[in-house]
Design a protein with these regions (language model features):
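Short beta-strand to alpha-helix junction loop
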Residues: 65-68, 95-103, 144-162, 172, ...
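Helical element adjacent to the flavin cofactor pocket in flavoenzyme catalytic cores
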Residues: 144-200, 211
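Glycine-rich FAD pyrophosphate-binding loop
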Residues: 27-47
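Conserved Rossmann-like nucleotide-cofactor binding loop
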Residues: 18, 42, 208
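Beta1/beta-strand and adjacent pyrophosphate-binding region of the FAD-binding site
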Residues: 4-18, 35
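Central helical "cap/lid" subdomain
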Residues: 195-252
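Dinucleotide-binding Rossmann-like beta1-alpha1 core, especially the glycine-rich loop
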Residues: 52-130, 260-265, 269-273, 420-422
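C-terminal catalytic lobe of FAD-dependent flavoproteins
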Residues: 260, 269, 283-286, 291-411, ...
Length: 435
């Protein structure tokens, strides 16, 4: 058994895709004396049950950069670290029901072009050429992203972990962190197996980030602005027509996003994966009667398909093939949300030599880029890209728990909402006011 490390340059708390990516990128930057702590097995939080979609599209410059980098990293990661990877680059089609949505797509295409990506606008008659099972009579067009796809979240995390270990970094599984303290300019990270003295500490604890954040309050920290949503997706039985089409064409269907109806539909082997972002959504662990469990590793919420009924019916009308298959499995798991739906990655406000890489709503898509950004913050003191929209310091003390819950539910229900200039979303109003 390996000796327990008592010192390190960096300790990362949390072993999901983001935490593993942070460790990998630090090690690649030459900082191999780093330790990742995971209370259970790697991926035990939100990573293991994630759908694994990997888009590049975003209307945020920071997020688009992270997601673009992730797709580039993932293409070569398996070979780079000698680990098997199921990464399918299928392309994706985002549907537009209005001219306003097409204008948003044109803007995203321009952003992508400036980052070296070749997003394409599709006319209505071009959509069926790429997705023959779709109804298009009420559409205005679509945005096609050739680099979109999906990846196995567990394989991704294990590949990043292997790459980090091969470079000399350490991963301690089944080693819960229990607190932190200061010793001069260093941090002492306490675990059930002993203490680790380090220069820097990273909160990458996913939906436990708020609980971990409490440990830093004596040293200038604040309550991490976040809440937790229930997100469901359903997997169908195999569909013979889909199997035949894939065999004939030699690849999977593009991932379909009906953003005005608020769901994604993806080919999963020879069936389909439907994941809505419903308006009548549900938050968890937001009040004393529904507390955050001490350990929710590898657990799910009970199925709750009734609140998805409208979205399932809408998807069946859009892709009638969906209605021919039975439901094989339902996944209903916790996903963390910040009040604006953006992750927290950067310096921990008010706390020296402490960083956050947490509250990733799309941690699989953004995980690769997040590791790069976090490693740059620690090793260089700055990032290549403008990351202010994801910086933890963008929030101040107006983000109480009621505000976080209201905004998180609003963001979830409008996951694909169009963000017009000067539009004021109603949830949480009057919480932040001028003097």
């Amino acid at each position: 058994m390996a000796e327990f490390p008592t010192t390190a340059r960096v300790v990362i708390i949390g072993g999901g895709a983001v935490g593993a990516s942070c460790l990998y990128h630090l090690a690649k930057a030459g900082w191999a004396d780093c330790v990742l702590l995971e209370r259970n097995e790697l991926t035990a939080g939100s990573t293991w049950h994630a759908a694994g979609n990997v888009p590049t599209f975003s209307t945020s410059w920071s997020v688009m950069n992270m997601q673009r980098y992730s797709t580039e990293l993932y293409r070569g990661l398996g070979a780079a670290v000698d680990y098997p990877m199921n990464y399918h680059v299928t392309g994706s089609i985002r549907l537009a029901h209005s001219k306003e949505r097409m204008q948003e797509f044109q803007r995203a295409k321009g952003m992508g072009k400036s980052q070296g990506m070749d997003l394409d606008i599709l006319a209505v008659d071009e959509i069926k050429n790429r997705y023959p099972f779709i109804e298009t009579h009420d559409l205005h067009g679509a945005l096609y992203d050739p680099n979109d796809g999906d990846i196995d979240p567990a394989q991704l995390t294990q590949a990043l972990a292997k790459g980090a270990r091969d470079l000399g970094a350490k991963i301690l599984r089944f080693t819960p962190a229990t607190g932190v303290s200061r010793a001069g300019d260093d941090w002492i990270v306490q675990t059930e197996k002993g203490d680790i003295r380090c220069e820097f500490v990273v909160n990458a604890a996913g939906y436990y980030a708020q609980r971990v954040g409490e440990w830093f309050k004596p040293y200038g920290g604040r309550t991490v602005p976040m809440m937790v949503m229930s997100h469901q997706y359903m997997l169908t039985d195999e569909i013979p027509e889909l199997e035949a089409w894939s065999a004939e064409n030699g690849h999977k269907l593009p991932l379909l996003r009906d953003v005005d109806s608020s769901y994604y539909l993806r080919q999963e082997k020879h069936g389909l994966n439907l994941g809505p972002y419903e308006r009548n959504c549900k938050a968890h662990w937001v009040n004393p009667s529904d507390p955050l469990p001490e350990d929710f590793s590898f657990q799910l919420y009970p199925d709750d398909l009734e609140r998805l009924e409208w979205y399932v019916e809408d998807a069946m009308a859009r892709v009638p093939l969906l209605g021919t298959a039975g439901v094989n499995k339902v996944i209903n798991g916790p996903i963390p949300y910040a009040p604006d739906g953006m992750p927290l990655i950067g310096p921990m406000p008010g706390v020296p030599n402490a960083f956050e890489a947490c509250v990733f709503t799309f941690g699989i898509a953004q995980g690769g880029g997040a590791g790069k950004v976090l490693a740059e913050w620690i090793t260089e003191g700055q990032t290549e890209w403008d990351m202010w929209s994801c910086d933890p310091r963008r929030y101040t003390d107006y983000t109480n728990q009621a505000y976080c819950v209201a905004k998180g539910m609003e963001v979830y229900g409008h996951e694909y909402g169009m963000h017009f200039p000067w539009h004021e979303w109603p949830a949480g109003r009057d919480q932040k006011l001028s003097p």
